[in-house]
């Protein structure tokens, strides 16, 4: 799952 700001998320992987 993409979980970095560029993907619109800010969760930890």
From Swiss-Prot:
Modified residues (Cysteine amide): 13
GO cellular component: extracellular region; host cell postsynaptic membrane
One MF annotation (Gene Ontology) recorded for this entry: toxin activity
Tissue: Expressed by the venom duct.
Alphabetic keyword roster: Acetylcholine receptor inhibiting toxin, Amidation, Disulfide bond, Ion channel impairing toxin, Neurotoxin, Postsynaptic neurotoxin, Secreted, Toxin
Domain free text: The cysteine framework is I (CC-C-C). Alpha3/5 pattern.
Family affiliation: Belongs to the conotoxin A superfamily.
Protein name listed in UniProt: Alpha-conotoxin GII
Organism this protein belongs to: Conus geographus (Geography cone)
């Amino acid at each position: 799952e993409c979980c970095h700001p560029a993907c619109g998320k800010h969760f930890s992987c």
